[in-house]
Amino acid sequence: MKNSTNQGFDQHYNAQVAVDQDSLLIVGQSLSNHPNDQAEAQPTLEAIPPALGTPSSAALDNGYFSAANIEHFKALRIDPYIATGRDPHHPSWHERFAQSLTPPPEQASPKVKMAYKLQTEIGKAIYRLRKCTVEPVIGIIKETLAFRQFSLRGLSHVAGEWALVCLSFNLKRLHTLTNGQLPPLRISPTGC
């Protein structure tokens, strides 16, 4: 990516995480050099190990919104809740106390249908959880673990570095969840 300040080029990467809502553990991670998040939902979802199962729903911010992503989630039987734009911080009292919206017609665009879905009570509740699931994890990685930039270069090396960052977050989180009382590691005398 062209850097306008020094006329050189910078390497930028797009790191993603899938976070379990109950434990706040990172269950899947991916990294790419794509400039936006629209193409990142599918690789991040595929990074979740099959042994953990498939989530029943997913809440994503508006950077992930596309008709293709909605169809991909539906094909996997995952109920998507993807923002369609920015919500105002302070809606007017008319909007706050407005009567319930009427469902959009069947031929409405995916964006109109998703906007309606997010205005339902269940849509609001599920999307609200995103703010206290994924965002704290990213904040802890940036602030507590002090990880703000990659030390390595090249996509494969940086992907490995991101995997280590996610692993270190999960170890820290497991320590918190178990109050530092992890079961002892048992090593058999034969080494197997």
Language model segments and positions:
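Anion-binding and metal-coordination hotspots
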Residues: 1-192
